[in-house]
Regions:
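P-loop NTPase motor domains
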Residues: 1-266, 281, 342-363
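Conserved ATP-driven motor cores of ASCE-family P-loop NTPases powering translocation/secretion/packaging/pilus
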Residues: 258-361
Length: 363
């Protein structure tokens, strides 16, 4: 792709993270906050940093897309989302690396900052986070975003902080830190405007790292939506996400990729082994919505016991064929009739030679 077609390449290798390119989730946030620091009058840069911080916090705290599903606990997750946004913005604004130093503003730093603030002994009835927020100007956005947590009772605030810590705890992995603590050579804005390809390699033997793949896909797609909205609702280049083994990834808010992505020139190609994987991860309704939003379906290579073959045989529909019988005897007779038959029966689908596929297209 790089040598022949001239693509800019990034390889995020979760199987061997020490050989992987970086993928710092705070790259765009840091970049725009640095631009605002250089030119305080550049309000647009600050607004973009805040927007990307909100996208990241929502992706981490509410991967399913909506805190309402948590019922009475929705307050804690919404507050945790605002709190994490504030933490990320504080890191981006006040902890830039000095000349010659490596980037130290990343998601692990966010965890350490929360942990350090919780460890600070109370001063005049306030914890470390409240003391830090008091140092900010009253109009600072980080202070506003964390307002729900700051104004709640001590026990409620502790629950909000614990929610943030529990979500960030998943990133504490020595190998994984070799990826998420270093900037990516490709960010969402570059990905949408240049010839770029990102290869994401998952370790089949260690499904614990699959969550980071789902997180990267979800965060990148939301950033691409934001980029598209700044350019009349369409990306400059068409973006295609080939998601092999999507059925083995943890469920995430995938439905907007189908419903909102198409109009923005962003296409998702989910590759699964069985329709049952979608139903297991997204429920019956979610699986139906995903299938209904796929304009083209390519399938083949079914196992002998596959139930997916039955479902796809029904989806192919039927045709009318002429059927009958002929009897030979003293009085020869024949009987012909028109009957309905599946276009391809499940047995016929299962017997398709390896390497051959059936394609169903819309229109």
């Amino acid at each position: 792709a790089r040598d022949i077609y001239g693509y800019r390449i990034s390889v995020v290798d979760l199987r061997e993270p020490t050989r992987s390119d970086g993928n710092n989730l705070l790259t765009l946030i840091n970049r725009y906050m640095d631009k605002h620091r250089e030119d305080p009058k550049d309000i647009g840069a600050k607004a973009k940093a805040e927007k990307y911080a909100k996208i990241l916090a929502k992706t981490i705290i509410n991967p399913d897309g909506d805190a309402a599903q948590y019922g009475e606990n929705a307050f804690f997750y919404d507050s945790a989302e605002g709190l994490l946004t504030a933490i990320v913005l504080l890191l981006a604004e006040f902890a830039p690396p000095k000349d010659g130093e490596p980037e130290k503003r990343h998601i692990v730093s966010a965890f350490k900052l929360v942990q350090d603030l919780l460890a600070v002994p109370k001063s005049r009835g306030k914890n470390g986070f409240q003391v830090l927020m008091d140092e900010l100007p009253p109009e600072h956005k980080a202070r506003w975003l964390a307002g729900a947590a700051l104004t709640s009772a001590d026990q409620s605030m502790a629950s909000v902080m614990s929610t943030v810590m529990s979500r960030l705890n998943a990133f504490l992995d020595t190998e994984l830190e070799q990826v998420i603590c270093y900037d990516s050579p490709i960010n969402a804005e570059m990905f949408a405007s240049e010839k770029c390809a990102i290869f994401l390699i998952l370790p089949e033997e260690d499904p614990a790292k699959n969550f980071i793949a789902a997180l990267m896909i979800q965060n990148l797609s939301r950033e691409l939506f934001s980029v598209a909205d700044e350019h009349d609702g369409r990306l400059k280049n068409r973006v295609v996400l080939f998601c092999d083994e999507l059925g083995t990834m943890p469920p995430f808010d995938i439905l907007p990729l189908f419903s909102a992505g198409r109009s923005r020139r962003l296409t998702l190609v989910p590759i699964i082994q069985s329709l049952a994987q979608l139903e297991k991860n997204y429920g019956k309704e979610g699986a139906e919505i995903i299938c209904d939003n796929c304009q083209d379906t390519i399938f083949g290579g079914f196992s002998p016991q596959s139930k997916t073959a039955d479902a796809l045989s029904a989806a192919l529909g039927s045709r009318t064929v002429l059927s009958g019988s002929v009897s030979q005897g003293k009085e020869s007779s024949q009987s012909l009739q028109m009957m309905e038959r599946a276009l391809m029966t499940p047995d016929e689908l299962k017997s398709i030679p390896k390497g051959e596929f059936v394609v169903m297209k819309t229109g």
